[in-house]
Design a protein with these regions (language model features):
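Exposed loop/turn and edge beta-strand positions of beta-sandwich/beta-sheet ligand-binding modules
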Residues: 344, 388, 445
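Surface-exposed acidic, glycine/proline-enriched linker/cap segments
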Residues: 377-395
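Short glycine/serine- and small hydrophobic-enriched flexible loop segments
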Residues: 90, 410-417, 465-469
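Short helix-capping/linker segments at secondary-structure and domain boundaries
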Residues: 6-10, 416-418, 470-474
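Periplasmic/cell-envelope proteins involved in peptidoglycan metabolism and beta-lactam response
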Residues: 1-377, 420, 479-482
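Short, glycine/proline-biased beta-turn/loop segments that scaffold the active-site neighborhood
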Residues: 110, 362-364, 372-374, 398-452, ...
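Residues on a specific face of well-ordered alpha-helices
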Residues: 31, 35, 39, 43, ...
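Second-shell loop/turn segments in exported
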Residues: 20-26, 67-78, 334-339, 391-398, ...
Length: 482
């Protein structure tokens, strides 16, 4: 449906080209139906001419024009169908997560194929923090619960150690090559480099880096330390020293690097993403447990307080924490959108095949349209990794799939690639393509099908052969441009 808000300067210019009544303080549709149907929904403004006294009080009204409401818009959507489909999509996604999340470490999971991907439970625990289901600020607040204080204390101890290790590594005259660092330390070093290269920081001038240099190639291959690579950057003038706090008019490479290290730690102090990266490894290394995070869900009122469950969590180990979180996903008390694990989005469009009317246009996840003008809520939506502001039903690019088969059939008949009474023999696997295209009935097959049978059975083999014929030139040779 969208929402309304004060017109922007750019939108005002567009609207005034159609209707000169629009003014800078007008409230207009900002998104959705409210925006696309703005000209229909807009009414006529009222006016009042009056005499007032010296303090602005109305004495006499001499003329008054009543405002006129705009046109009504009637949607073809079925509200109950919308709600039902949204709930179905959410439960389907939850079902996929229940099959995907396993109580194993990442290195214990054996990848077989894309249809059987498994996720370690620690990914789900981390997403409680990474997708802001749990508030890091609440962990450190005066009102924090015992378990929140416990989590925060572990984080503070780890952060002090990590910052000391990073500083020691950066300032060491014999710095470790990237490939010889631990996975965790390597992740922190890469994060620092990525941060310095970001548009926000702009300390590393990416366009000035010589990508053919030996140092750059060594960096790409983890064969150089971050310290040595940044020293190379200082010498090569792709470190923007104006962003650093260098007081001396003349400074050598050591002065610049020292200022660069100070800059890194000053800015990482309030960097939420770096904080989350530390939590990622605290969870991976079993320093912060799943049990603690599940208890924090009650402390922060993400879950309605349940004394029996809280006591059971406290008395149990991480195996029960896994079972607990799976139950919350199963009951949609923790939603796929909150975890923002793949998959966490879905959509569904239902049309009336007789009239073309759209009966349901559902995107998951969604948001509360009544709160969209709340800046805090809007910021929360923008930070949500499940992208609730994206309308998956209208903005996601999808292959048309079998719905395009009738168009292919019509093209085949019009171009003479097939006659209405001609058949194509479906053997189950179309081998003219590489790799072969399997019919949905494979290892079964449809046998001979004419155009009507091809459409009726939605036969992949039939339409693969028909599409192939449409791509042949006059001599029967394949032409990829046809």
């Amino acid at each position: 449906i969208g929402y309304t808000g004060k017109v922007t300067t750019e939108r005002l210019e567009e609207l005034k080209q159609v209707n000169d009544d629009y003014e800078l303080n007008d409230v207009v549709g900002r998104t959705g139906i409210e925006s696309s149907m703005e000209l229909e929904l807009k009414g006529q403004k009222g006016s009042q001419t009056a005499y007032v006294d010296n303090v602005g009080r109305i004495l006499t009204i001499t003329d008054e024009v009543q405002p006129v409401a705009g046109n009504d818009i009637w949607l073809t959507l079925d509200l109950n169908l919308q709600k039902a489909i949204y709930n179905i999509l959410e439960r389907q996604l939850a079902g996929v997560l229940l099959k995907t999340i396993v109580n194993k470490e990442a290195d214990e999971i054996v990848y077989t194929d894309s249809s059987n991907i498994k996720l370690p439970i620690k990914d789900a625990y981390f997403q409680l923090i990474n997708n802001n289901v749990l508030s890091l600020e609440q962990f450190a607040s005066d009102e924090a619960s015992d378990v929140e204080r416990q989590i925060n204390a572990k984080y503070l101890n780890a952060r002090a150690r990590i910052e000391n290790d990073i500083r020691s590594e950066l300032l060491s005259g014999n710095a470790t090559l990237m490939r010889d660092l631990s996975e965790e330390m390597q992740a922190y070093m890469i994060y620092i480099y990525t941060y310095l290269s970001s548009d926000e920081a702009g300390v590393i001038i990416k366009d000035s880096i010589d990508t053919k240099s030996a140092e750059y190639q060594a960096w790409k291959n983890n064969a150089i330390s971050l310290r040595d690579y940044l020293y190379y950057g200082i010498a090569s003038n792709w470190i923007d020293t104006t962003k650093l706090n260098i007081t001396s008019k003349y400074s050598n490479a050591d002065d610049v690097f020292s200022a660069l290290v100070d800059y890194v730690f000053q800015n990482l102090a309030d960097d939420t993403e770096f904080t989350k990266k530390i939590y990622r490894y605290l969870i991976n290394n079993n320093v912060v447990s799943g049990k603690e995070l599940c208890l924090a869900l009650y402390s922060q009122n993400v879950l309605a307080y349940d004394e029996a469950e809280v006591n059971r969590l406290r008395a149990s180990g991480d195996d029960y924490a896994f079972e607990f979180l799976m139950n919350k996903i199963r009951n949609i008390e923790i939603t796929p959108a909150q975890l923002a694990l793949d998959p966490c989005t879905a959509s569904c469009v239902v049309t009336n095949v007789r009239t073309g009317e759209v009966m349901a246009l559902v995107t998951y996840p969604s948001y509360d349209n009544n709160r969209i003008s709340d800046p805090e809520y809007f910021a929360q939506l923008n930070a949500d990794q499940s992208l609730p502001l994206r309308n998956n039903a209208t903005q996601t690019l999808k292959a048309p799939g079998s719905t395009f088969k009738p168009i292919t059939a019509i093209a085949g008949l019009e171009e003479g690639a097939i006659r209405i009474d001609e058949t194509i023999n479906c053997t189950g696997e179309y081998e003219e393509a590489n790799p072969p295209i399997k019919c949905w009935k494979y290892p079964g097959f449809h046998g001979p099908l004419n155009v009507i049978g091809g459409i009726e059975n939605s036969c992949n083999y039939f339409f693969s052969e028909l599409a192939h014929r449409l791509s042949l030139d006059a001599d029967g040779n394949y032409n990829p441009d046809k």
